Amino acid sequence: MPKWKRRRYMSHIGVICDREDIQATMPQFVVGNARTLLARQIAALRRGRPLNVRLIRQKSAWSNGRLTAILVRHIAAALDGRSGRARDVQVLLLLDAAKIHFTPAVLRACKAANFWLVIIPPRLTFLIQPLDTDAFALYKSVLLDAYQEARSRSANADGDLSMTEFLPCIDGAIQSVLEGRPWAAAFDRDGFGAGQRALDDRVKTRL
């Protein structure tokens, strides 16, 4: 693989919730480093993206505390945009134990949004984090299929996709998987709903 390709990275900070009626409004952050999302292209690439998909260009494609705090504010704005939140509903924000997820800025954002931050313990995301247990594997599979299909249609002789060609693959996978499926049962099975009455046996066995 050419060196220039090895320097190009993207990540997707995904959000799902247990409310099917608002899932499509949840923010999705697609992050690319400066070598992947070129400064001269970023404005054009952002045009035409779904309203809840934010394309972010920064030095690194990895998330950080600043982005996490921004994400919290975007989630709060999406919820408040739905005629206000019901007073009897408490939002739980489930994040893994990476240090970037509980920086002072993130904690302040959660407090301002009245979110309860729930940190999934290390090495347990595979078991009780709904994105990991139910969403990401399917999302990656759908994205790979879309990528291969786009490559087959690409005008480039080597099959490489431009960002203009690749980003719709991500948009489609988000809409098909993250927004196109109900996730309440996943939260229930992982222990975050239904009073834990629907807790999956695999969780009981492993914990």
PLM regions and their residue ranges:
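RecA-like helicase/translocase P-loop NTPase motor core
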Residues: 1-207
